[in-house]
């Protein structure tokens, strides 16, 4: 058999797509205080950053993946809301307006593993997000 067609699959996205957001609020939260949609109590005192983006944008509601803020990986806490989700920044104090990387070509597999899915689902989940295309 001889074919003249190639299916590129993930090669079309890998390394070419990043999802960047920003911190919309950050605060110290005490153990037992409620964070996220439906109210998930925190197990420890910690710093929490609230990131713009929620299930309306393609963030998994029940188990949002974490994000990178200030070079630190921050695990998600609570259930994502329609427009915001929370991450535990631990000792790092995030600033309002600070850049947040949800994933990029290097970290999409981590996001997929946290959501117990494949990279393709992470790349294609985003809906109303503003796209920025750069010529390379």
Regions found by a protein language model. Name each.
Residues 1-136:
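Active-site anion/phosphate-binding pocket segments in diverse small-molecule metabolic enzymes
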């Amino acid at each position: 058999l001889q074919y003249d067609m190639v299916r590129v699959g993930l090669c079309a996205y890998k390394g070419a797509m990043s999802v960047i957001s920003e911190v919309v609020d950050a605060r110290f939260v005490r153990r037992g205080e409620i964070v996220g949609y439906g109210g998930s109590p925190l197990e420890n005192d910690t710093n929490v950053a609230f990131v713009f983006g929620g299930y309306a944008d393609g963030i998994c509601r029940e188990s949002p993946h974490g994000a990178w803020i200030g070079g630190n990986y921050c695990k998600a806490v609570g259930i994502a809301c329609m427009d915001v989700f929370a991450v535990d920044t631990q000792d790092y104090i995030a600033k309002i307006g600070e850049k947040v990387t949800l994933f990029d070509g290097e970290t999409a597999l981590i996001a997929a593993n946290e959501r117990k899915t494949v990279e393709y689902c992470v790349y294609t989940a985003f809906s109303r997000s503003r796209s920025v295309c750069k010529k390379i």
